Amino acid sequence: MIMPLINGLKITLKHMFMKPVTLQYPDERPTPSPNFRGLHALKVSHDKAKCVACYLCPTVCPAKCITVEAGEDATHDKYAERYEIDMLRCIFCGYCVEACPVDALKMTGQFELANYKREDFIFVKERLLEKK
């Protein structure tokens, strides 16, 4: 009758000295793994976005949340004049990153998406270029 009580206390004492699993979130930030698929970001090369407006990312996107409009510069090179991602529709699958032939898009480790207005969830090109 006393042995089950002692065994229970043994388990309790063992767990008291273990490292806690839970993080106190606002104070302690988790470090996401390198494979974590967070917010999107456009990569920059020579002070401009690497995107060549090939339309592969909106084509492979299962949620149809990416909008691209192409433009041409003075040297007749294509670039994304308008690039938008609607984060309310995005499922963070990463297909857009895998499909990009010039490696212009990446998934960052940022995961905090809280906003008050729906417009804040539509990420335009300038906002995607800010993310490092």
Swiss-Prot record:
Cross-referenced InterPro entries: 4Fe4S_Fe-S-bd, 4Fe4S_Fe_S_CS, NADH_quinone_OxRdtase_chainI
Topological type in the membrane: Peripheral membrane protein
Assembly and oligomerization: NDH-1 is composed of 14 different subunits. Subunits NuoA, H, J, K, L, M, N constitute the membrane sector of the complex.
HAMAP family cross-referenced by the UniProt entry: NDH1_NuoI
Co-factor: note: Binds 2 [4Fe-4S] clusters per subunit.
One GO MF term: quinone binding
Cofactor: [4Fe-4S] cluster
Organism for this UniProt entry: Geobacter sulfurreducens (strain ATCC 51573 / DSM 12127 / PCA)
Record-listed E.C. numbers: 7.1.1.-
Function: NDH-1 shuttles electrons from NADH, via FMN and iron-sulfur (Fe-S) centers, to quinones in the respiratory chain. The immediate electron acceptor for the enzyme in this species is believed to be ubiquinone. Couples the redox reaction to proton translocation (for every two electrons transferred, four hydrogen ions are translocated across the cytoplasmic membrane), and thus conserves the redox energy in a proton gradient.
Cell location: Cell inner membrane
Residues that hold [4Fe-4S] cluster 2 according to the record: C61, C90, C93, C96
Domain 4Fe-4S ferredoxin-type: 42-71, 81-110
Location (main, coarse): membrane
Similarity comment: Belongs to the complex I 23 kDa subunit family.
One of the record's GO cellular component terms: plasma membrane
Top-level taxonomy: Bacteria, Pseudomonadati, Thermodesulfobacteriota, Desulfuromonadia, Geobacterales
UniProt-annotated binding residues for [4Fe-4S] cluster 1: C51, C54, C57, C100
Protein's UniProt keywords contain Iron-sulfur: yes
Protein name per its UniProtKB record: NADH-quinone oxidoreductase subunit I 1
Keyword list, A-Z: 4Fe-4S, Cell inner membrane, Cell membrane, Iron, Iron-sulfur, Membrane, Metal-binding, NAD, Quinone, Repeat, Translocase, Ubiquinone
Enzyme class: translocase
NCBIfam families: NuoI (TIGR01971), PRK05888.1-4 (NF004538)
Reaction equations catalysed: a quinone + NADH + 5 H(+)(in) = a quinol + NAD(+) + 4 H(+)(out)
Gene assigned in the entry: nuoI1
